[in-house]
A protein has these predicted regions:
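ALDH superfamily catalytic-core signature
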Residues: 1-145, 167-169, 173-174
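Conserved glycine-rich beta-strand-loop-beta hairpin in the small C-terminal domain of fold type I
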Residues: 90, 133-136, 153-159, 178-182
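Bilobed periplasmic-binding protein-like "clamshell/Venus-flytrap" ligand-binding domains
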Residues: 114-120, 180-188
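Cytochrome P450 core scaffold surrounding the K-helix E-X-X-R motif
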Residues: 147-152
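Active-site donor-binding acidic/aromatic loop of nucleotide-activated sugar
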Residues: 161-163
Length: 188
């Protein structure tokens, strides 16, 4: 991004380069949970989470909301059909490089060390016939806190972090204060 920005500007071009993103989904206690879960599945795990507008952080307002969200989402993440793009029914393919796979799994390792609950673990995924492929399974982390690298950094992979703010104002402040704010969805 920085290279493209500098080259474009040096050549008199108008350039907008967003060099990092952390998109949030706020889920209020009165949200239609089925709708929020379905939206999270596509937004977090589509394209193996490797797109700039992927949702990578869910701010479920209140513990009851977070519990309901995680309880409904976890089985869907576990059921993701992962494989090569040309296989029938595949919902998620590999990440782009071996380095990306190692980096993503390193973030999951660090999140676990920092105290996040690994509800669904996508590390170490091996698919028959593609044992050396760059596959990372859908990962769901709960009880993530704002100081954890899995929240602070852009992971760019199929990892969804759930935080548990206790009010809309607290959730809103998390979005506002995040270094990589980009897009936010609110379910209410």
């Amino acid at each position: 991004g920085k290279y493209i920005y500098s080259r474009g500007c040096a050549n008199g071009k108008r350039v907008q380069a967003l060099c990092g993103a952390k998109n949030h989904m706020i889920i209020m206690p009165d949200a239609d949970m089925d709708q929020a879960v379905d939206a999270a599945m596509g937004a977090a795990y589509g394209s193996a989470g490797e797109r700039c507008m992927a949702i990578s952080a869910v701010l479920a307002v209140g513990d009851d909301t977070a519990d309901r969200f995680v309880e409904q989402l976890a089985p869907k993440v576990r059921a993701l059909k992962i494989g090569q793009f040309d296989e029938p029914g595949v919902e998620m393919g590999p990440v782009i490089t071996a380095e990306s796979k190692a980096r993503i799994e390193g973030y999951i390792d660090q999140g676990e060390k920092d105290g996040a609950d690994v509800v669904v673990d996508g590390r170490g995924l091996k698919l028959q016939g593609y044992e050396d492929g760059f596959f990372v399974g859908g990962t769901l982390l709960d009880r993530v806190t704002p100081d954890m690298s899995v929240y602070r950094d852009e992971i760019f992979g199929p990892v969804l972090s759930v935080l548990r703010p206790q009010s809309y104002d607290e959730a809103r402040q998390l979005v506002i204060n995040h270094e990589y704010g980009n897009g936010t969805a609110i379910f209410t």
